[in-house]
Amino acid sequence: MGFRSKKKVIAAKTAAELDAMQAAGEIVGKALQAVRAEAKAGMSTWDLDQIAEQVIRDAGAVPTFLGYQGFPASVCASVNEVIVHGIPSKETILEEGDLVSIDCGATFDGWVGDSAWSFGIGELDEEVQGLNLATEWVLMEGMKAMVPGNRLTDVSHALEVATRKAESKFGVALGIVDGYGGHGIGRHMHEEPYLANEGNAGKGPVIQEGSALAIEPMLTLGTEDSAVLEDDWTVVTLDGSWASHWEHTVAATKGGPRILTPRY
């Protein structure tokens, strides 16, 4: 899969605009931390959604996901073989050993923060733990390419290279989910360009100082292929293998990549 934008550069934000984006991103970070702290077996994914929404609204922000293209909740809650876009539900009850991805967005003063992480309910199986640690590591390694002067697919390539290194580092075989990836972000959650999680380096628009991308590797213990369920949102692995999803909103600066969705 290739890059989808014909623009020669990725739009840049000013220093003040990046600060505004980080203010939104910090709210997202607090929401994610609150969800993880409260999550336990016997709770529903709807319960987790309510926790995140409360944190976002208490901070004076608005849940970006709620109502976005008709999405009915404030977070995406994706469990086990669900890769992304899981709809929180009172019927989805968490069990010990589940791997849960929470993807969350907040809009604050007109700017959007978008971030995700995956975590276990209780203790994870060794292979699943390896998958989750690997996906987090791939995110942190891949974002190192988010520097002025690089091109869009330099980030894609860095993510792919990190994924292959992670297989030996964490002792797991990993599938890179095809057809899903990161994106530009700012006043809107999804802006140009689309960011693939694999590919050749040196292509696509140039990253400028102040360019911002949501970088989000999605890895599985099996297939690269996925399917969308009848709800038109939930994306699952085609072979039932479990998936992990990690995401940060990241800006390119003179000092290197700047995470705009920190979790303090």
Cite the ranges covered by each PLM segment.
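Active-site neighborhoods and metal-handling regions in enzymes and metal-associated proteins
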Residues: 1-264
